[in-house]
Amino acid sequence: ESSTSASKEFLGLEYAQYAKADVDFRYHFNFGRNKEQKIATRLFAGYGLAYGNSDVVPFVKQYFSGGPYSVRAFNIRSLGPGTYADTTSEDNSSFFDRTGNIRLEANIEYRFPIYSFFKGAVFADAGNVWNSVGNPSFNGQDKFTSNFINELGMGAGVGLRIDVQGFVIRFDLAAPFHDPGLPEGERLDFRFDDPVLNFAIGYSF
């Protein structure tokens, strides 16, 4: 009763209260003949804080990891939170729950011309999402700790870009080599026989 009476409302409806802060640092270095080759790097950090009416950041505002604009060696929303691994579903049916209020990511990519509007890339990605307060549903595996470096999902791959006057169609084939969902000591797992194909419009960074 007391918590309900203290809740803030607008037009008779209770609303969510939260704040988010993102840092997205990108650096591109061009080199080679006519500066046609490029090293592109990106560092991303995001944090969401719920307060007032809300115990958690609204689902649609939480972070996820994996996919063509994230860690490309993992399917979209299939990475994390933390060291959590979904062992109950083989068809990724529970991917909607794999979000968190903390996200860290790093990417590096070497881009080079092939022929005409065809361009290539070699890249590596690392990242994950966590929760600042552990969710009992994840048995504490989702909580952010000082051991976060060992909980990063990592992968590498190659890509083909079709770049027509700035309109880019992108294909990336990536495989994981560090999976935080595996038991500690077994996470360095080179799965080049099980790559993930990503399709996207535009560059990821």
Could you tell me what each predicted segment is?
Residues 32-34, 116-120, 162-171:
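Repeated loop/turn-to-beta-strand initiation elements of outer-membrane beta-barrel proteins
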Residues 125-127, 132, 157, 161, ...:
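Flexible, small/polar- and glycine-enriched "cap/hinge" segments at structural transition points
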Residues 41-43, 108, 120-124, 160, ...:
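Membrane-embedded beta-strand positions of outer-membrane beta-barrel proteins
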Residues 27-29, 110-112, 162-164, 173-175, ...:
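Residue-level signature of outer-membrane beta-barrel architecture
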Residues 136-164:
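Strand-loop-strand
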Residues 162-166, 192-205:
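Outer-membrane beta-barrel "beta-signal"
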Residues 1-112, 123-126, 130-133, 137-142:
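C-terminal outer-membrane beta-barrel translocator/porin domains of Gram-negative envelope proteins
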